[in-house]
Regions:
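Intrinsically disordered, low-complexity non-transmembrane regions of multi-pass membrane transporters
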Residues: 1-19, 25, 71, 75, ...
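Alpha-helical transmembrane segments
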Residues: 167-185, 295-303, 326-327
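Hydrophobic transmembrane alpha-helices of secondary-active transporters
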Residues: 34, 57, 84-109, 243-246, ...
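Interfacial helix-loop-helix linkers and transmembrane-helix boundary segments
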Residues: 39-48, 66-67, 81-82, 102-117, ...
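Entry/N-cap segments of selected transmembrane alpha helices
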Residues: 32, 108-129, 280-307, 358-362
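Transmembrane helical segments that form the transport core of multi-pass membrane transport proteins
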Residues: 223-310
């Protein structure tokens, strides 16, 4: 009888119920909200579902993120090994490879002025950097946090790893991916506030056709120019352009399909679950996390506003040929931000089709965010 009693006692002690804290319950509730938003309302489920489930797992069973050196037998938890690939910047670079294989740079090639809108939207990054410094973060931590303003999860993870800011990598990544998912909610009020209905109704001229030669030369030229000026961007820009060269060359169909489908989705699973697993209650529920989340929101709003305002300047300079709404797509949430530009424009005029025009600034924003990350790395002497 004593044996049975001891066995039952041990079993009860091993359950998660005996170890759950109030903080764990809060994070489990947050994970469930994320799952609800992703499944019920379709808020970027490819991102939110794995992130939320990783969040759920680590707050029920913390040892799933146990570091190998902290383990009695030298074996870490499953998601710890996924997370190591984040720290080594492998997964963010592979994400860029997949994004490149899926991206059409045609709108950007056809309208190079889109680069200016993509650059303007990066203002949010530097606003976040100054804000983080003002809040007492170190210069490297501020730089890592600031990339949230570009709404670029992989680049946020990449820079945090390179600057050795692993203590705040989890909150940075969750904030960046959350704001990427919430683009359809955050951006429209800002876009409508800064534009008139007349501006939102502006119809833009159809983009010129882009030749196959231009499409092939673009990733090669961008790689040479950007990586020569900022060699530290090579892992991101290089992989982005390699993926795009796969797509546009037309001679490596199998590589294109693998990079844009199977590999991409495998990496999303690994990246999403490992990012979610960094949000244990002990690591996530603190004032620094709240500051990071707040800074990210402010930075993203600033980036959106800067893009729209620069779009208004271009509208004035071209005598009404540019719809300012496409400026908000300069953040690098591809293709969510471009879809939002299309949606807001269509609300003003259902016959207005802005998607392809917005894709120019959108893909320019991807390059711009990577360049901003490379600039910070160069400033801090990181290779």
């Amino acid at each position: 009888m004593e044996y049975i009693s001891n066995t039952l006692g041990n079993l009860i002690d091993q359950t998660a119920f005996m170890n759950l804290t109030v903080g764990n319950l809060i994070m489990i509730a947050v994970a469930c909200v994320f799952l609800y938003l992703a499944i019920r309302h379709g808020f970027e489920p490819l991102l939110l579902v794995p992130i939320a489930f990783g969040m759920l797992l680590v707050n029920i069973y913390p040892d799933i993120m146990l570091h190998a050196e902290d383990s009695a037998n030298g074996t870490g938890g499953l998601l710890y090994y996924f997370y190591v690939l984040d720290e080594w910047s492998i997964l963010p670079s592979l994400i860029f490879l997949g994004v490149g294989a899926m991206t059409d740079f045609g709108p950007l090639i056809a309208n190079p002025k889109s680069f200016l809108l993509g650059a303007a939207a990066q203002f949010g990054i530097f606003a976040a950097y100054l804000g983080a410094m003002a809040m007492g973060f170190s210069d490297k931590a501020a730089a890592a946090i600031s990339i949230i303003g570009g709404a670029d999860g992989p680049t946020s993870i990449f820079l945090a790893g390179k600057l050795q800011q692993t203590a705040i990598l989890g909150p940075i990544a969750v904030a960046a991916y959350s704001y990427m998912s919430l683009v359809p909610i955050i951006q429209p009020p800002i876009m409508k506030l800064l534009t008139t209905e007349k501006e939102r109704k502006i119809k833009m001229e159809q983009l010129r056709p882009v030749s196959k030669l231009e499409r092939i030369l673009f990733p090669i030229i961008v790689t040479i120019v950007v990586c020569t000026i900022l060699p530290t961007t090579a892992p991101l820009v290089g992989m982005l352009m390699l993926g795009n060269l796969f797509k546009e060359s037309g001679v490596v169909r199998q590589l294109t399909e693998t990079a844009s489908n199977a590999l991409m989705y495998i990496v999303v699973i690994l990246l999403g679950t490992s990012v979610g697993a960094t949000t244990s209650a002990e690591a996530f529920l603190n004032w620094d996390t709240l500051k990071i989340v707040a800074l990210g929101l402010i930075a993203f709003a600033f980036g959106t506003a800067a893009g729209v305002l620069f779009g208004k300047i271009m509208c004035w300079a071209t005598k009404g040929k540019v719809n300012p709404l496409i400026g908000s797509a300069g953040v690098s949430a591809v293709p969510m931000a471009a879809r939002v530009s299309q949606k807001v424009g269509a609300e003003a005029d259902p016959t207005n089709f802005l998607l392809m025009h917005a894709m120019g600034p959108n893909v320019a924003g991807v390059i711009g965010t990577a360049v901003a990350a490379g600039t910070f790395m160069a400033i801090f002497g990181v290779k």
